[in-house]
Amino acid sequence: RRLSLHEYLSMGLLQEAGISVPHGVVARTPDEAYKIAKEIGSKDLVIKAQVLAGGRGKGTFEGGLKGGVKIVFSPEEAKAVSSRMIGKKLFTKQTGEKGRICNQVFVCERRYPRREYYFAITMERSFQGPVLIGSSQGGVNIEDVAAENPDAIIKEPIDIVEGIKKEQAVRLAQKMGFPSNLVDEAAENMIKLYNLFLKYDATMIEINPMVEDASGVVMCMDAKINFDSNSAYRQKKIFDMQDWTQEDERDRQAAKADLNYIGLDGNIGCLVNGAGLAMATMDIIKLHGGTPANFLDVGGGATVHQVTEAFKLITSDKKVLAILVNIFGGIMRCDVIAQGIVVAVKDLDLKIPVVVRLQGTRVDDAKALITASGLKILACDDLDEAAKMVVKLSEIVTLAKQAHLDVKFQLPI
């Protein structure tokens, strides 16, 4: 999992780092938006919906308001527009039909750019480290620019040990087309952004656009920052900023239980240890005509509690008609997984078929636990056979539902 912050929080981090950004304040009610607009004192303001999704500007709110980024010209208008955003769901291409709730808006001064540029820092495997990315074409979808004109994207790899050098930032600013009198200022902003990237264990910082504004100042008009979830233990300040209202409830529960979970569209639940084995398990389910309902990696040191929580996560998805547990016990002990399965099946009064494939450390103890439980858990030593079995069982349950038959795999028998 990666952490994404709201724009106003990202802009706050930039401001702390001494990077030029437009003045703005977050508002959580229309009345707050009115008050902030009045305090800013400008007749030109921008109201930005704070929703963790791309394409806000082209989105639509429930209630009919078009666009999650609006220009307003008075505190009264700021209040009126905010009232149509706050507490409403915004639907974009990225959110799909579920939409995402807007709980706050960012009220900021409007700046007039002479030119717009694109700038980002990300980790890239081909360079085995961080890379600066720039383009003279900012303020637009950079993926479209890359597809239509790949030469417009400039990359500058950074040696992770030596760090960024001023000549690298200057070279990139020149290639991006900054006027000669602003090259040094643009380069200084890039260096500050790189230092921010390292300080907070970011995996990406995207500024779109970075601009030369009408007063001749280089400014970052927007900021998107992603953080490495592995750094949560030392980036408490950052991870405490996470807005869980923007996440699926299952993602929240998975994070709480320290499980790697991603919900999918299928009907076969998967519980696996190890990301590689989890992906291979999903592949083999697809190979035999099934569709995985999730990616779920319990890791190498899962406890009975975590396995139970994993089952709760899987079964909270009402599309799930069968479950495949695939464990290769190296560090992970098979008997711990078996205890978790037995506890979960009993606690949840599970009525859907569970196929279990266990191999490795203490596998015989695990099989004995499952047998002694008296539960109808279907064991299989071969992964290919286990996948075929769970796909077939999901098809049986599907047919029963289509025929309006109350066919359940009663556990225990």
Swiss-Prot record:
EC numbers for this chain: 6.2.1.5
Enzyme class, broadest EC rank: ligase
Cofactor binding mode and count: Binds 1 Mg(2+) ion per subunit.
Predominant location category: mitochondrion
Essential cofactor(s): Mg(2+)
Record-level GO cellular component terms: mitochondrion; succinate-CoA ligase complex
Record's subcellular location: Mitochondrion
Keyword line: ATP-binding, Ligase, Magnesium, Metal-binding, Mitochondrion, Nucleotide-binding, Transit peptide, Tricarboxylic acid cycle
Domain ATP-grasp residue range list: 11-238
KW Metal-binding (keyword) present: yes
Gene3D superfamilies given in the database record: ATP-grasp fold, A domain, ATP-grasp fold, B domain, Succinyl-CoA synthetase domains
SUPFAM superfamilies registered for this protein in UniProt: Glutathione synthetase ATP-binding domain-like (SSF56059), Succinyl-CoA synthetase domains (SSF52210)
Single GO biological process annotation from the record: tricarboxylic acid cycle
A molecular function (GO) term: ATP binding
Annotated ATP binding sites: 48, 55-57
Organism superkingdom: Eukaryota
Substrates-to-products reaction catalysed: succinate + ATP + CoA = succinyl-CoA + ADP + phosphate
Annotated metabolic or biological route of this protein: Carbohydrate metabolism; tricarboxylic acid cycle; succinate from succinyl-CoA (ligase route): step 1/1
Tissue/organ expression: Widely expressed. Not present in liver.
Residues of the site described as Important for substrate specificity: 44, 112
PANTHER family cross-referenced by the UniProt entry: SUCCINATE--COA LIGASE [ADP-FORMING] SUBUNIT BETA, MITOCHONDRIAL, SUCCINYL-COA SYNTHETASE BETA CHAIN
Quaternary structure note: Heterodimer of an alpha and a beta subunit. The beta subunit determines specificity for ATP.
Role this protein plays: ATP-specific succinyl-CoA synthetase functions in the citric acid cycle (TCA), coupling the hydrolysis of succinyl-CoA to the synthesis of ATP and thus represents the only step of substrate-level phosphorylation in the TCA. The beta subunit provides nucleotide specificity of the enzyme and binds the substrate succinate, while the binding sites for coenzyme A and phosphate are found in the alpha subunit.
Protein name: Succinate--CoA ligase [ADP-forming] subunit beta, mitochondrial
Organism this protein belongs to: Columba livia (Rock dove)
